[in-house]
Amino acid sequence: MTGWVDRLRRGWQRRQFRNSEWRFLFDAPPPGEWVALDCETTGLNTRTDEIIAIGAVRIVGQRILTSERLELLVRPEGDVPAESIRVHRLRAQDVQAGVSTEEAMRQL
């Protein structure tokens, strides 16, 4: 029963999404495939803090495809607070050579 509900929800979400470049994100995923995603941020406030690192790895069935992993440093617009450095060990000088947020989303 949830199959048709999921398809209906994805269709509605796709129509609501104005930027057609990203509409594929609402397509049904391939069966048995997943992506494990990890993000490091400058803090926990979704309105003010930024992503500064993204890691992703593809999983197919029971296999983790480490050869298809993605590791990105993302250049923040603001500062990297000392509190977040203690958590993920990424300093401002580590992420300054990173890609822009927009480029990171495209690569992801």
Task: Please place each PLM-identified region on the residue numbering.
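Conserved non-catalytic scaffold segment of RNase H-like nuclease domains
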Residues: 4, 11-108
